Design a protein with these regions (language model features):
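Post-signal-peptide, soluble extracytosolic/periplasmic N-terminal scaffold domains
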Residues: 1-58, 62, 66-70, 111
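Outer-membrane beta-barrel translocator domains and adjoining extracellular loop/strand segments
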Residues: 25-40, 76-83, 133-142, 147-154, ...
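Extracellular loop and loop/strand-boundary signature of outer-membrane beta-barrel proteins
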Residues: 36-40, 82, 92-97, 106-108, ...
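Residues on the lipid-exposed face of transmembrane beta-strands in outer-membrane beta-barrel proteins
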Residues: 3-5, 52-56, 109-113, 166-170, ...
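Transmembrane beta-strands of outer-membrane beta-barrel pores
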Residues: 19-23, 58-62, 69-73, 127-131, ...
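Beta-propeller domains
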Residues: 71-72, 79-81, 92-94, 102-112, ...
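Repeated loop/turn-to-beta-strand initiation elements of outer-membrane beta-barrel proteins
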Residues: 10-13, 23, 60-65, 117-123, ...
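Residues that define the transmembrane beta-barrel architecture of outer-membrane proteins
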Residues: 1, 46-50, 57, 101-107, ...
Length: 262
């Protein structure tokens, strides 16, 4: 469903709503330690998307601002199956979590302008937030190896995901064109650390008593490229360009990588 309101010659407001329902049966790959199998997976989920915004269109420029929300609702919190192989250590069944209910919120801004010499500049920014608070499944279906109660009922996941982009294109002379772009992406995990102090279970068969805290990670990525074109003749053009990328990560074996071509 989409609705548009013309507020004036240059300004307009809009609202969009979309629902996607998925029901039926798919397939899932699961495992019991050293063995693997494919089993039917019931599907029963809904994705609702909402967007509200305003836009402005001028003689040689435009701007658009909107608020976007996407909600994922999975009626199934987990998938349980009978072990078709000879059970080991009491593991007659297995279980794994399905995709958790989650929500994504974004503020989106885009703008652009045209100037002399066939020059145009574009900018876009996305401020995003991801969250989920689905209940955690118990450690295992095998009571004989369970280390006890979970440290908390839900992960309460919370992450910020932002993006900024800039583009430039110009045709200053009849034979020369230049194009360039730059972007910055970042992911920041704000989820409170969760520690399984009494250990964990592997494949519903083995209990490991050591305390474990899953690592969280953040990253920042900066990318840029520029390309120039010179027309020697109608069918002969020379191109020159360069591109580069820098990626910084936390809690990884390699915390920074840099790539460049030209």
């Amino acid at each position: 469903v989409a609705v548009d309101w013309r507020l004036s010659k240059a300004f307009a407001a809009f609202a969009n709503f979309r629902r996607e329902d998925k029901e039926g049966t798919g397939y899932a790959g699961v495992g019991n330690f050293t063995t693997a199998l494919q089993i039917p997976e019931p599907l029963d989920s809904t994705i609702d998307s909402y967007e509200l915004g305003v836009q402005w269109n001028g003689k040689s420029a435009f701007a658009r601002l909107s608020y976007f929300v996407q909600e994922y609702d999975d009626e199934l919190n987990g998938l349980t199956w009978d072990n078709p192989y000879v059970p080991f250590n009491g593991a007659t069944t297995g279980r794994m979590a399905t995709a958790p209910d989650n929500e994504m919120e974004q503020i989106l801004l885009s703008a652009g302008a045209h100037f002399a010499y066939d020059t145009s500049i574009g900018f876009n920014a996305i401020f995003g937030k991801l969250s989920q608070d689905d209940a955690l499944l118990p450690f295992t279906t095998n009571a004989g190896v369970s280390p006890g109660a979970l440290p908390r009922a839900s992960l309460n996941g919370d992450a910020d995901v932002n993006h900024f982009g800039l583009t430039l294109a110009t045709h200053p002379l009849d034979k020369i064109r230049v194009r360039g772009s730059a972007s910055y992406d970042e992911r920041k995990d704000n989820t409170r650390s969760i520690t399984f102090a009494d250990g964990y279970v592997e494949s519903d068969m083995f209990s490991f008593p050591d305390s474990i805290t899953p690592e969280r990670y953040d990253y920042e990525r900066l990318r840029g490229e520029i390309e120039g074109e010179y027309r020697l003749y109608d069918n002969v053009r020379l191109f020159v360009g360069a591109r580069g990328e820098e990626l910084k990560r936390t809690e990884q074996d390699v915390d920074k990588t840099t790539e460049g071509t030209g």
